[in-house]
Amino acid sequence: MTNQTVPPLFPHRHLLGIKGLSPLDILCLLDLADQEIAVSRQPEKKKSVLRGRTQINLFFEASTRTQSSFELAGKRLGADVMNMSVGNSSVKKGETLIDTAMTLNAMQPDILVIRHASAGAAALLAQKVGCSVVNAGDGAHEHPTQALLDALTIRRAKGGIENLIVAICGDVLHSRVARSNILLLNALGARVRVVAPSTLLPSGMADMSVEVFNSMEEGLKDADVVMMLRLQRERMAGSFVPSVREYFRFYGLDKEKLKVAKPDALVMHPGPMNRGVEIASDVADGPQSVIQQQVEMGVAVRMAVMEALLDPRRNPSNGEAA
């Protein structure tokens, strides 16, 4: 009888985006993340699965929340974690991303976590190094671990994702979070809506299998999940909204607008929040908010991603697939 090779649960070498992942890949990561939550909640928050492995966090954009989450995730798995301070690095002296990648690659890391302002930076890095690469956000392109943690939060609260109405509201144009969430939620069978002023909607939304609304009252009607997005004024070269006050009046989530969603609708925000701009404080801190749960799920998801990419018991080839 011929022995059959059991395929790895997660056959990818890198996590560069949600695009390219199958529903089975996504569920594999969510199921593993469910197990990681228990590790984070026990007194001894430590596994040895990545003992002896090296993780380098390479953040070209400031991010207290995401960088801290990746650092904590690596340490809880037993990895040696190095945070590279780009502000004090050779990058500030004119070194290119590829030069930096080649230098780091020579140090033989096992995984590089990168955040960069340019779309495609993570994919470029993955072509130049011999280790796994995780995209922690590249321009307005993708933020895969944010979409995964959002999905985990929804699934744990609602019991599943299929057929849920999820309204993604706000600055969709500049949001890598929106793009990754749309891809993931569609893959798992949710009904996705985007709600934004026309000036903050990217072209091609109709091709992403979403319903588009310019009115919060219409877009939030009977929604199971309301996902607010940060107004990214630092990425805006021109005047996309008349004023912050006007934006909150029409697109900020307050109790009155939330009433048109389902009574048990979840309120989400990827952070950092601009209170009084995208969301009212009494909603952000209210009983329907799962914003703090999202933060907790972030550590679990990032643990799952790195364990899936690096643990030979889960990925014996350490990912020959892209």
From Swiss-Prot:
Its EC number is 2.1.3.2. Keywords: Pyrimidine biosynthesis, Transferase. It catalyses: carbamoyl phosphate + L-aspartate = N-carbamoyl-L-aspartate + phosphate + H(+). L-aspartate binds at residues 93, 176, 230. One of its GO terms (molecular function) is amino acid binding. Gene3D superfamilies: Aspartate/ornithine carbamoyltransferase. Carbamoyl phosphate binds at residues 65-66, 115, 143, 146, 271-272. Belongs to the aspartate/ornithine carbamoyltransferase superfamily. ATCase family. This is Aspartate carbamoyltransferase catalytic subunit. It comes from Brucella anthropi (strain ATCC 49188 / DSM 6882 / CCUG 24695 / JCM 21032 / LMG 3331 / NBRC 15819 / NCTC 12168 / Alc 37) (Ochrobactrum anthropi).
